[in-house]
């Protein structure tokens, strides 16, 4: 879908090359997912796994960023969200590359005979506590159905030796997630701390882990400048996706 041919619609988010409907998904398209999909390293990637795809946002972004020969498997537990992801994929330029699986990743992963160079997830991060408005939203937001230790273990079983496992998390939770990953034998290779503007402390962190040891590259990304417009660095990262950048 070209920019000139794109139509703004109310039930989702219009990007330059695709549209993501999310009205039947517990978690809507947001800055976290867009950041992660634009940031994850894709050089030499041959196969991608999206854990908890929701609306299919990350799978679609990564399909746009990678070669047409790269398959993307997107796994989603919630049947309603998975159906909407399938519809979003069907209307995108990449229906031949993205496969949406309606399944629990804990059941799906052990059945796989191939490994993935890139595994990506915008995971739940709240411990069970205050109830959400719907069971679907609770599932998407809370770790009861997929705790971080289980997620890290599944990724370890599915990844290639030199692959990357990428997540986005709130800053403090990301620090705890990193320590947990290191304790399980992962190596932190990329870290970007994200702040709303220069005056604020980082509120999100983008993390890339690998089974393979190596130098860790760290930086900071500010979303908005002092004029409240998107910063140059945020624009450079996401302009291939945002419709009016």
UniProtKB/Swiss-Prot annotation:
UniProt GO cellular component terms: cytoplasm
Protein's GO biological process: methylation; tRNA processing
Alphabetized UniProt keyword annotations: Cytoplasm, Methyltransferase, S-adenosyl-L-methionine, Transferase, tRNA processing
Catalytic reaction(s) noted: adenosine(37) in tRNA1(Val) + S-adenosyl-L-methionine = N(6)-methyladenosine(37) in tRNA1(Val) + S-adenosyl-L-homocysteine + H(+)
Pfam family membership, one: MTS
CDD domains: AdoMet_MTases
Class of this enzyme: transferase
The protein's Enzyme Commission number: 2.1.1.223
Record localization: Cytoplasm
Gene3D superfamilies: Vaccinia Virus protein VP39
Alphabetized SUPFAM superfamilies for the sequence: S-adenosyl-L-methionine-dependent methyltransferases
GO molecular function terms listed in the Swiss-Prot or TrEMBL record: nucleic acid binding; tRNA (adenine-N6)-methyltransferase activity
Keyword Zinc (UniProt): no
InterPro entries: DNA_methylase_N6_adenine_CS, SAM-dependent_MTases_sf, Small_mtfrase_dom, tRNA_Adenine-N(6)_MTase, tRNA_adenine-N6_MeTrfase
Functional summary from the UniProt entry: Specifically methylates the adenine in position 37 of tRNA(1)(Val) (anticodon cmo5UAC).
Family to which this protein belongs: Belongs to the methyltransferase superfamily. tRNA (adenine-N(6)-)-methyltransferase family.
HAMAP family recorded: tRNA_methyltr_YfiC (MF_01872)
PANTHER family: TRNA1(VAL) (ADENINE(37)-N6)-METHYLTRANSFERASE (PTHR47739:SF1)
Name listed for the protein in its UniProt record: tRNA1(Val) (adenine(37)-N6)-methyltransferase
Lineage, uppermost ranks: Bacteria, Pseudomonadati, Pseudomonadota, Gammaproteobacteria, Enterobacterales
Gene (name only): yfiC
């Amino acid at each position: 879908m070209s920019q000139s041919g794109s139509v703004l619609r109310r039930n989702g988010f219009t990007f330059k090359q695709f549209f993501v409907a999310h009205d039947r998904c517990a978690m809507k398209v947001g800055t976290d997912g867009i950041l992660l999909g634009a940031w994850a390293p894709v050089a030499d990637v041959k196969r991608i796994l999206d854990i908890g795809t929701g609306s299919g946002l990350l799978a679609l972004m990564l399909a746009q960023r990678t070669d047409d020969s790269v398959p993307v498997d997107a796994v989603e537990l919630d049947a309603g969200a998975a159906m909407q992801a399938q519809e979003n994929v069907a209307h995108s330029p990449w229906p031949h590359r993205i496969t949406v699986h309606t399944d629990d990743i804990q059941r799906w992963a052990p059945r796989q005979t191939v490994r993935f160079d890139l595994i990506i997830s915008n995971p739940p991060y709240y411990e069970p506590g205050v109830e959400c408005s719907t069971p679907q939203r609770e599932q998407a937001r809370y770790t009861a159905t997929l705790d971080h230790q289980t997620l890290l273990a599944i990724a370890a079983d599915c990844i290639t030796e030199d692959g990357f496992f990428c997540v986005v998390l709130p800053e403090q939770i990301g620090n705890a997630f990193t320590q947990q990953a290191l304790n399980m034998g992962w190596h932190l290779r990329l870290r970007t701390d994200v702040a709303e503007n220069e005056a604020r402390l980082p509120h999100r962190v983008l993390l890339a882990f690998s089974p393979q040891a190596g130098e860790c590259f760290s930086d900071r990304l500010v979303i908005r400048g002092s004029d409240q417009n998107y910063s140059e660095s945020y624009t450079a990262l996401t302009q291939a996706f945002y419709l009016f950048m």
